[in-house]
Amino acid sequence: MLPDGVADVLFEDAHKQEVLRHQLTQQLITHGYQLVSPPMIEFTESLLSGASEDLKRQTFKIIDQLTGRLMGIRADITPQILRIDAHHGGDGIARYCYAGDVIHTLPSGLFGSRTPLQLGAEIFGCESIAADIELIDVLFSMINSLDMSAVLHVDLGHVTIFKRLAELAALSASDTEQLMQLYANKNLPELKQVCQVLPMGSDFYTLARFGHDIANLLGRLSENAQQDTKIVTAIDELQRLKAHLQVQWQCAVSIDVTELSGYHYHTGIVFNGYINSETQPLVRGGRFDGMKSNQLATNQPRQATGFSMDVSRLLAHTQLDAPFIVLIDYDAFNNLDSAQRQLLLQQVASLRQQGYRVTMPLTAEDMPVGLTHRLSLADNQWRLHAV
């Protein structure tokens, strides 16, 4: 019996998942991203260094039988990429991509998987919005290469706006958490009441009430907020990224500056990619801090941005070409002399190179599922014909 949130990926779905993994990683490699493959397990002091409480809860812990130290089974590959960059990235721009299994203690959502196949890309060492634009472009190039019938909708946010307002208002940690909870619940009436007694409360309410209208948001904020360089820059970055998406990819874009689910991890632009009417995002991405390789002891950050997705979520939205499944005539195969058998094996090798799936039967009853063709002997020649 399998636990809840854990399932076998079988047959054609398993084949499709492997094709998708290979195709998407090759797309990333051709865009200049270096493929890395971190291990499934690490000591928790490195795997969970700086991790959010949510990630810590999602991580299975085990005892290393060699050392007695606590190890974690990765629930997210991104922290491992931070470690790799800290030791190998240097001070310049570095691009990484990856694809691997992760394991969660709890499913995300009611029917979520606890064993996603996580694929992603990261850029380290670039503060410019050009890095975020590049990642978005790479993401759409990947999705378009799959020829999906589903349409990708992007929801943009920027944690700097709320974070900076909280600093200007000198909010306590409890007030900050309360506002974030009200934003998450979309509870405008209660939010309005709470904001009436908060410093710069009108600004916090404005984020929820008018934050989707990014072109006019700055003008609705207080003069103090309007004059803050970080807030002005954040709004400008959102406008530029939205315009780029609409012009370059003609996709639907929405803005939600109160999307703060990664508040304690992200440091700037955040984005979620949704397909069709699904409520859980297919892709999550945004800005975060890495660590400079020569400054680990001083804990100084290295700018980074990235995205990740669960490849298995694509299975329902993609189709592969129908396979050609070939069976060799059992009786004819077993009556061949050595020379004839060698000629047959050469033809079988040629068919397999062309993508045919050729089964050499072990018995007369040995027949593959989904048979489309037979290879039969006629007039001393092996002929392929549809069934």
From Swiss-Prot:
- GO cellular-component term (any): cytoplasm
Family (UniProt): Belongs to the class-II aminoacyl-tRNA synthetase family. HisZ subfamily.
The molecular function terms of the Gene Ontology recorded here are: histidine-tRNA ligase activity
Primary location class: cytoplasm
Question: Can you name this protein?
Answer: ATP phosphoribosyltransferase regulatory subunit
Outline the subunit composition. Heteromultimer composed of HisG and HisZ subunits.
The disulfides recorded in the entry are none
Pathway the protein takes part in: Amino-acid biosynthesis; L-histidine biosynthesis; L-histidine from 5-phospho-alpha-D-ribose 1-diphosphate: step 1/9
| Extra information | This function is generally fulfilled by the C-terminal part of HisG, which is missing in some bacteria such as this one.
Localization (cell): Cytoplasm
Per the entry, what this protein does is: Required for the first step of histidine biosynthesis. May allow the feedback regulation of ATP phosphoribosyltransferase activity by histidine.
Its GO biological process annotations read: histidyl-tRNA aminoacylation; L-histidine biosynthetic process
What Pfam families is this protein classified in? tRNA-synt_His (PF13393)
Q: What NCBIfam families is this protein classified in?
A: PRK12421.1
Recite the UniProt keywords alphabetically.
Answer: Amino-acid biosynthesis, Cytoplasm, Histidine biosynthesis
